[in-house]
Amino acid sequence: MAARDYYSRGQNLVYNRPVLVIFAVIGVFLVFDILRQVGTGTMVVTDLMSYLWNGLVLGMSLGLAGVGLSMTYSILNFANFAHGDLITSGAFAGWATAFLIAGLGEFSVESLILIGGPIAVGSNELGINVVNTPLALLAGLLVAAVLTAALSLLLDRIVFKPMRSADGVTLMIASVGVALFLRNFLTYSFLTDSRGLTGGNVPQFTIAGVTFGGHQITLVVVAALLMLGTHILLQYTKIGTAMRAMAANKDLAKVTGIPTERVVKLTWIIGGGLTGCAGFLIALQQGTLTVTMGWDLLLLVFAAVILGGVGSIYGAMVGGVILGIASRLALVWIPASFLLVAAFVIMIVMLLVRPSGLFSGRTTA
């Protein structure tokens, strides 16, 4: 009888959700192919572990960057296309601070805050990394968080608050205008040159043939701590309770006495702070910075958020990690130039199989 029930359920699944079945079969095939390659020696185990580690690093970057985006959507119900340029703004603010502290007293302030531009002090002269200049990096991280939070709050006050009653499409279009303004302001201030950030011997650790970069470890650890802090904030504080209530039903939250406008401000502050931290850490791990860094990442961040479930903060975290690891594992079969394609294929598959994402129905909770 049990076997007949399983057969009946399987038959219903094939008839009702054939797309899910097809992709499940493909997924199982790919997993077995990886195991086959490892078993036959076609692929070395250390290569597989490197793919997983690099995927985790990318995933934590996308997850942390996606938290602020999900916060904005869950409370204000619009896709903020200025989010990528907020990432970049945080990175520039933080790294200008790190350069200033690392070289203060040896070089002029003007040459330091330009962050290694054409007429500025280069990163090799300062030797910035997690071992040589930890205090400069810590100060840069804090400034990136504070200034991006302040910038987010300012943009809300000037642009989004007067449009609070507008629909999501109108707010989204407004955010595109904000993105263009921020990017052009950064271009005017810092030019478009790609600049190196870190110098000296960046520490590396090799375990079982897998290399773990010091800046990669820093990103993963700090991002994990920030995500844990966000979880504690949402689940165990009055602010978090108010945010979850407002995300679930804004009108009901207002009727019950929750100060909705204050919650909106706190959302921008917290989301902006996390976004600034993400920008600073991503630039640290990459070792370079450009005015288009955040814009280039934005589609991947959106993909991570969609994968996890739009408006779900936990979904953004998990979606980022899954997307990062899966896209790096795709290197087993495709060239590196197709990594973006692999990431978006994963997103499209999720939209076909589960349109609401992994954490569907959950917003900030």
State where each predicted segment sits.
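Hydrophobic alpha-helical transmembrane segments of polytopic membrane proteins
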Residues: 64-69, 147-150, 299-324, 345-351, ...
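Membrane-interfacial amphipathic/re-entrant helices at transmembrane-helix boundaries
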Residues: 2-64, 79, 107-129, 167-168, ...
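Single transmembrane alpha-helix segments in multi-pass membrane proteins
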Residues: 47-106, 158, 163-165, 309-313
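Alpha-helical transmembrane segments within multi-pass membrane transporters and channels
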Residues: 103-178, 318-323
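Helix-loop-helix "hairpin" substructures at the membrane interface of multi-pass membrane proteins
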Residues: 213-289, 318
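Pore- or pathway-lining transmembrane helices of multi-pass membrane proteins that form conduits
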Residues: 84-89, 155-156, 160-189, 293-306, ...
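Cytosolic-side transmembrane-helix boundaries in multi-pass membrane proteins
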Residues: 1-37, 189, 193, 251, ...
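Inter-helical junctions in multi-pass inner-membrane proteins, predominant
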Residues: 39-54, 233-238, 264-308, 329, ...
